[in-house]
Amino acid sequence: MKGRLLDAVPLSSLTGVGAALSNKLAKINLHTVQDLLLHLPLRYEDRTHLYPIGELLPGVYATVEGEVLNCNISFGSRRMMTCQISDGSGILTMRFFNFNAAMKNSLATGRRVLAYGEAKRGKYGAEMIHPEYRVQGDLSTPELQETLTPVYPTTEGVKQATLRKLTDQALDLLDTCAIEELLPPELSQGMMTLPEALRTLHRPPPTLQLSDLETGQHPAQRRLILEELLAHNLSMLALRAGAQRFHAQPLSANDALKNKLLAALPFKPTGAQARVVAEIERDMALDVPMMRLVQGDVGSGKTLVAALAALRAVAHGKQVALMAPTELLAEQHANNFRNWFAPLGIEVGWLAGKQKGKARLAQQEAIASGQVQMIVGTHAIFQEQVQFNGLALVIIDEQHRFGVHQRLALWEKGQQQGFHPHQLIMTATPIPRTLAMTAYADLDTSVIDELPPGRTPVTTVAIPDTRRIDIIDRVRHACMTEGRQAYWVCTLIEESELLEAQAAEATWEELKLALPELNVGLVHGRMKPAEKQAVMTSFKQGELHLLVATTVIEVGVDVPNASLMIIENPERLGLAQLHQLRGRVGRGAVASHCVLLYKTPLSKTAQIRLQVLRDSNDGFVIAQKDLEIRGPGELLGTRQTGNAEFKVADLLRDQAMIPEVQRLARHIHERYPQQAKALIERWMPETERYSNA
């Protein structure tokens, strides 16, 4: 193996890696030894010295050593094994809920045990629940760790101990195999070498300050952060350069349909809408594909902007596809577009994952023949069996739910006769500038920074759950006396559609009992699309007074008569999501209210979050605060997409570096194309195939 580059050495060449483990590691994108070395610890534990048991404080993670005094199994509400150890300074109780006979036998009275875990204050003094422990041999001195212990991001079935053993082998290979130095010499001068940085971060010596690692300031981290941010920026430059090599259908001015639609509208577009439409039309007139992100706050009128862009393509006899993240939102878009386009003689088609059989086949045929000019749906519209007929524009609503890879896959799908479609991406989640510079560097950006006239700002209050009855009375008053409608949103911390649906059903039953004079509807993610649509339609038509819902109504639902929103457990959601939910009210001229019904006690972070919402209705201000409180991954929807997910860099912490990184990335892109390509391959392997398009 000597002399090989580590990106060419598969993990299967390491001891202990068989087919089953290989498959599990592949789930976290670990395929080669280089991947493993770049899979860096999330945090570190200090197991390099012993704590006297008598000095343990609650909440401290510590290593202790003691002699087993007793070990007992009890059978109460659940089986439990407790083992007490003493080091002379105090007694520690170790508690285990998952255990076996071998564990019980190993913890015999008189044995010496080394244990690591979080100290808690228990009924009988200090205790640890499920500590990691090791029975000591006859050595008089305990075998302590020589370096800080790394804790890695992992996946089901891969233990920390496994990752540590594999990383030990990978670090040994650094002596015989090379990990290629990709930074040009003028950039890497005076910096730690890559092998040095990797050794330091995987096995930090006990002398190293943990605070440096926690703040991302250690030279080893700075070395890798620079490389990763460069790779990210280089991939965006490659995407842009790639896009410039593609051909798109140039769609010149042809305004007859647009003018007809504008004349039929009961309102005039805002100045911001008109400006953004002009920017889009300028892009679409070129023979390279448009790649434009339109940011607009909740209720700023992005749908009309999308419709006007679509008409430019339809006027040239081309097709337009609009993709939304949920069936509910896609269906609402389809209804909106039908209302606007039917009088113009334009047929709007609708495709969703749940469509089956003949209906789906008929829709696919209508798309393939070109009979349907505007296609609306979820990601189902980009499945293999859907064939377009001259697709010239792709509109993606709510970008964060898709991510860069899906965005690029759409391009490939849309390519026909050598032409790529223009792309328009719309998001109602305003993105702070630093974040947009990195995460969306491949896109041009337009901002709709003006709300339509006649919108009244929503008043937001935070009220503890103990006053639930008062809030129910407030709902009764709004619906019966004021003739308004209301939303009651249930949120759950677990990302489980089933549990969320059950919580919503329980709340629905409770509110039907408490408010017998109201018609109360229910909508959640586990209902069939047709059922959801039926409930939403009756709410929109005013047949229901109150709608109990999960966060499925977060985006796009438009009922101007709804003026009151209750959000339960708002402390469980991020600011951007709360702002989205709140945006479902305040869509008419009447004063609207949002009640954040929280459970006490509130954490400090939750207090700050709710205060931000009470103070501001501006999505951009809220997004900046959200970034400061939560960090970029959550803000960009990393949970769903993997977009903007960094191994060492942190866009919030490292934002000061971004302008300089962009300058360096341009330098490498122009002067060192081979290194640029290799850096992207190293840090962002999934993006590589698009960069070469």
Curated annotation (Swiss-Prot):
Residues 482-628 form the Helicase C-terminal domain. One of its GO terms (biological process) is DNA recombination. The wedge domain within the N-terminus inserts into the replication fork junction, where the lagging and leading strand split. Belongs to the helicase family. RecG subfamily. It comes from the Bacteria. This is ATP-dependent DNA helicase RecG. GO terms for molecular function: ATP binding; ATP hydrolysis activity; DNA binding; DNA helicase activity. It catalyses: Couples ATP hydrolysis with the unwinding of duplex DNA by translocating in the 3'-5' direction; ATP + H2O = ADP + phosphate + H(+). Its EC number is 5.6.2.4. Plays a critical role in recombination and DNA repair. Helps process Holliday junction intermediates to mature products by catalyzing branch migration. Has replication fork regression activity, unwinds stalled or blocked replication forks to make a HJ that can be resolved. Has a DNA unwinding activity characteristic of a DNA helicase with 3'-5' polarity. A motif (DEAH box) lies at residues 397-400. It is an enzyme of class 5 (isomerase). Residues 48-146 are annotated as: Wedge domain. Transmembrane segments: none annotated. Gene3D superfamilies: Nucleic acid-binding proteins (2.40.50.140), P-loop containing nucleotide triphosphate hydrolases (3.40.50.300). PROSITE patterns: HELICASE_ATP_BIND_1 (PS51192), HELICASE_CTER (PS51194).
